[in-house]
C-alpha cells in the first residue's frame, strides 16, 4: 500500500493540474512534435499517452510533426546528403519524393497508430488532403549578396491554411496528426518547415497555445543558460548578435508570428524530458522558454 506521503504527493499533483484543466477545456493546443521525442521508444510512448490524456480532459490537441533525422537517414540510403540553408532543407525533386514518403507515410502513420493504441482517435493528414495547406515556392534572401534570392527547390512558403477540415475532425473528437507537406496551384508538392506550419496553423485555428518540442531545454543564451522568457524585442537582439541561429531560427520566427497574430502563448520545450508536454500545460512552473509579445 502506498505511504501517506506518496498518496499526498499524487493528490497535490492532481490539485495543481485542476485549474489548468478548467482553463484549457475546449481550447486548441497546437503541438509541433519533433526531435528525440520521435526517436526514443519510451518518449514516443509517453508522448502518445500525454496527447490522449489532454484530449480526455477536454482539450483539443493538434499535432504537426517533423522528421528530419528520418529523412536524412533515408537520403543516405540512396546516396544523397541533406543540405540546409538558413535552417531550411534544400529540396530537389528526388529529395521531395523521399520527404513525402517519410513524412506522409512512415512517420505520420506511426504517430497515428501510437495514439490510437493508447486510446485516442487520431487521423493522419498532409496538407495535400483537401488541399488544406496551400503553398508556393519559397525563395531565401542571400545574406552575402544584397538584393539576391536563393532558390532552394520544392520548399514551400505557406499561402493559406483552410481550417474547415481540422474543425470537422474536432467536432468528431478526432486528433489530427499533420505532416508538413503543402500543395501548389499546379498540384506540385512542397516541403514546408514543420515549425512554420505549426505556427501558421495555430494562428488560423486561434489556438490557446503553440508548443514546439526540441532537443534543447529551450532557447539558450551564449553561455548555455536557459532563457525562460523572451519578448519580441529581446528576440531581435538575440538574432542580431548571433545567439539564435540554425534550426532555432524557424522556431523563433514561428513563435513570434504566432503571438503577434492572436495565439495566447508559445512555448519551446525539451522533448527529451518525459512528459514535458504535461509539465508545460498542467503545472504552475511549466518548462522551457515562453515567447510573448512586447505588450
Curated annotation (Swiss-Prot):
- This protein's source sits in the domain of life called Bacteria
Q: Which residues bind substrate?
A: 67-68, 89, 191
* Any one GO molecular function term: ATP binding
What InterPro entries does the record tag this protein with? AceGlu_kinase-like_sf, AcgluKinase_fam, ArgB, Asp/Glu/Uridylate_kinase, Glu/AcGlu_kinase, NAGK-C
Q: Does the keyword Signal apply?
A: no
User: Which transformation does this protein catalyse, written as a reaction?
Assistant: N-acetyl-L-glutamate + ATP = N-acetyl-L-glutamyl 5-phosphate + ADP
Question: Is RNA-binding among the key words of this record?
Answer: no
Q: What is its main location?
A: cytoplasm
Q: Which family does it belong to?
A: Belongs to the acetylglutamate kinase family. ArgB subfamily.
Protein name as annotated: Acetylglutamate kinase
Species for this entry: Nitrosomonas europaea (strain ATCC 19718 / CIP 103999 / KCTC 2705 / NBRC 14298)
The uppermost taxa in this organism's lineage are:
Bacteria, Pseudomonadati, Pseudomonadota, Betaproteobacteria, Nitrosomonadales
Q: Which gene encodes it?
A: argB
